[in-house]
Each structure stands twice: as C-alpha cells, then as structure tokens.
Amino acid sequence: MINQGPVITIDGPSGAGKGTVSQLIAEKLGWHILDSGALYRLLALAVSHHGMSSDDVETLKVLAEHLDIQFQQSEEGKVEIILEGEIVTQAIRTEEVGNCASKLAAIPEVREGLLLRQRAFSQSPGLVADGRDMGTVVFPSAQIKIFLTASAEERAQRRLQQLQQKGEAVNLGGLVKKIKERDERDANRAIAPLVPAAGALVIDSTNLTIEQVVEMIFAETAKAGLV
C-alpha cells in the first residue's frame, strides 16, 4: 500500500462524533476526507434498490467493487453524495440504512470489496479517514490514530436530537437499545472488529464539546510535525 500523503484515522462507534470532528479537522488542515461509513451506507442503499439478497456474498463483493458513486461539492460548500446518478445525501442517513450497513460490514467479502476503494482516497496533501477500522485495517501505517468514543446513552441523545431536527418521531430508549446492539455486532464480528488501533489515542467525548475534541486531535497533529 502506497500512501500519497499523511493520514489521520478517526475510528469509533456510531454517534461518537467522528463525522463532525473529521470534517472540522480536514477543513482546518486543508486535507481530503474519507467518510467510510457512507460507503457502507451507499452499498446498503444499492442493495435495497436492486432487491438483492445479503446472502449472495460474491454478488455483494462485485457490487462493492464497482459501486457507481460520486462525491460532489455543492455551491454552498456541502458535499453531495450521488449513487447511480441520484443524490442520496439524506437517504443514506436513515436508521434503516444504517442498520443494514452495519450488517453488510460484518461480511468479509464486502469489506474486501471496499478496501482498495477506501485506500484510493489517500492523496496529497493528506487524508482524514473516519470509520471503524481505518487505523486497524485500511490505513495501519497512519501517522496519527484516534479512537473516539462516548457512552451509549450520550450517543443516543445526540442521535435523538438529529432525528428530531429532521421531524422524525423517535424513542430514546429504543435508540439506546439499537446502539448497544450495533456496538456488540461491530465489536464481535470476525473480521475487522471495532477496537482501538495499536498506539491510538483514545478520546471519550461523553463530557467534551466538539471543539475540545478537535483541539486535542489538532495538538496531536502538531506534535507529530504534520502542521
């Protein structure tokens, strides 16, 4: 694997704040960003669109390798995600798609199919990679590895606020249950389980602001001589 620039990996469970933190760090450094979770969500949406079975692992692998996706920046500066010619930026963020993506991520052939696509994001001047196995599998030689976590209750509360802002009626208790189930599935899968990478800085964001987390990671970046 040949990296085209330095890499910061930010791994952790759903709702820990990886996406927001990664975007802010990437903007601050002027680096590229990889939202690996979006790739699995895109695959889940494509599987649904094509009426495919999650048991047909070889077909899933081929779909993962050849998924027709684009990331385009809008005039407002936001990144629009396009699947097979259709803008799906919001469609991939539903709970249903997220749960399906988590199940697909437990299939070794699917992870293998997406591996090279993820590594291709590593380009100069640098990359901030957000996911669950960025530091352990996808970019094991990354210069900085972060494992960002928070309590299940805090992550459920954050997700509740996001969904309520979208006008969705959700139950906090149900969200906590789903998050704990997903945590267990991610941590116990046979391939690329969700664990901190060797040498990773573990940050518990339960009682921290986004700004505090960003400053902690930026301090590590400066200490490593990357800025």
UniProtKB/Swiss-Prot annotation:
Q: Which residues form the signal peptide?
A: none
Primary location = cytoplasm
What EC designation does it have?
2.7.4.25
What are the protein's UniProt keywords?
ATP-binding, Cytoplasm, Kinase, Nucleotide-binding, Transferase
Q: Which residues bind ATP?
A: G12, P13, S14, G15, A16, G17, K18, G19, T20
Which molecular function terms from Gene Ontology are attached? ATP binding; CMP kinase activity; dCMP kinase activity
EC class of this enzyme?
Answer: transferase
A GO-annotated cellular component: cytosol
Q: Which Gene3D superfamilies match?
A: P-loop containing nucleotide triphosphate hydrolases (3.40.50.300)
Where in or outside the cell it occurs: the entry states:
Cytoplasm
Q: Which InterPro entries match?
A: Cytidylate_kin (IPR003136), Cytidylate_kinase_dom (IPR011994), P-loop_NTPase (IPR027417)
Q: Which reaction does it catalyse?
A: CMP + ATP = CDP + ADP; dCMP + ATP = dCDP + ADP
Q: Which GO terms describe its biological process?
A: nucleobase-containing small molecule interconversion; pyrimidine nucleotide metabolic process
**Family statement:** Belongs to the cytidylate kinase family. Type 1 subfamily.
Database matches in HAMAP family: Cytidyl_kinase_type1
User: Under which name does UniProt file this protein?
Assistant: Cytidylate kinase
